[in-house]
Amino acid sequence: MIFSTERQSLIRWSAVVLSLCLNPVLAATESDREPINIQADRAMVSELDGLSVYSGHVVITQGSMKILADEVRLKSENNQLTTILAVGDVAQSGLAGFTRGATRDLESITASASEVEYLVASQQLTLRGQAVLSLGQDRYQGNVLSYDIAKGIFKLESGQDPSDRVNLTINPKADQPL
């Protein structure tokens, strides 16, 4: 049982950490002003260690953004979020998922992998295990996918099996000449 002060601390810590972690990934959108909702079977927060862990059918939403995972770990140092790690097994698919609807300035994003890691300071998104990232109509698929959000650079790696090659589908933009 979580006592009242522990529950308040958990809620406060969760809101601070999630507002720090979600805004850099999503850039400034109208969703940033919407409430952050967290649903999970269990939550553990250690303010001293800068770690919070949500487990069991985790659903995190804010506006058009949604994270689905079996477990989400948030790590911070000096009250600054450093790492977000989402691990799969959502509805037994084995994959963690992230979606964000399109905005006026940004295309929609859908990502899934066995493990999704985001390093906040360097804006590095890494998908490991059956990695798929859709950015608008473009699709990137591989065993490991690294995306430097600030620089717009993708790096994909194939799996061990020769048939497990990287796969990219890039559609021409309507306003770009062929």
Q: What function would you assign to each model-found segment?
A:
Residues M1-L178:
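Mature-chain termini and adjacent capping regions
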